[in-house]
Regions:
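Bacterial N-terminal signal peptides that target proteins for export
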Residues: 2-11
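Bacterial N-terminal signal peptides
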Residues: 11-19
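Boundary of Sec targeting at the N-terminus
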Residues: 24-27
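Electrostatic cytochrome c docking/interface patches
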Residues: 29-59
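Short, flexible, mixed-charge acidic loops at enzyme active sites
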Residues: 32-35, 77-82
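Sequence/structural segment immediately N-terminal to covalent heme-attachment motifs in c-type
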Residues: 49-73, 79, 102-108
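Short, non-ligating residues that shape and space the ligands of small metal-coordination modules
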Residues: 73-74, 122
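Extracytoplasmic electron-transfer domains, predominantly the class I c-type cytochrome c fold
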Residues: 81-135
Length: 137
């Protein structure tokens, strides 16, 4: 009976490892990442002034640059190890999204990007969005 439990535990571990490896090595494009309508409608309460953008740039450098890169192109030093690849934050598709949609994504995260609701204050997240809006200009 004890031997049987060991085999079940070992088989479960192998199966779990295979599932994780399959997910992380998959070349399939991730499904569209859409913010809920209510979240997308949320307005940015932080003015996109010089101070806010500068503060957002500092937060971005500490939390986002490793994957998204200096110019937001998704080519940061850690991007090679990330699957799926980080989005290009300077592309038109990102620019078309509302501040509320970007805030929701930054807050909630989606693998491999972590959620920043516990790491960054609301103000810092809005500042990052103000900074991201300057990328590609």
């Amino acid at each position: 009976m004890i031997v049987e439990k060991k085999y079940v535990a070992a088989a479960s571990g192998v199966l779990l490892s295979a599932l994780v490896a399959n997910y992380s090595l998959s070349d399939e494009a991730p499904a569209a990442w859409e913010a809920p309508t209510r979240a997308a409608a949320k307005k940015n309460p932080v003015a996109a002034d010089t101070d806010s953008v500068a503060a957002g740039k500092k937060v971005y450098a500490s939390n986002c640059l490793a994957c998204h890169g200096e110019k937001g192109k998704g080519d940061g030093p850690a991007s090679a190890a990330v699957n799926p690849k980080p989005h290009d934050l300077a592309e038109e598709a990102v620019k078309k999204q509302s501040d509320g949609a970007l805030f929701w994504k930054l807050t909630e995260g989606r693998k491999p990007m972590p959620a920043y609701d516990k790491t960054l204050s609301e103000s810092e997240r809005w500042q990052v969005i103000n900074y991201v809006r300057t990328l590609g200009k």
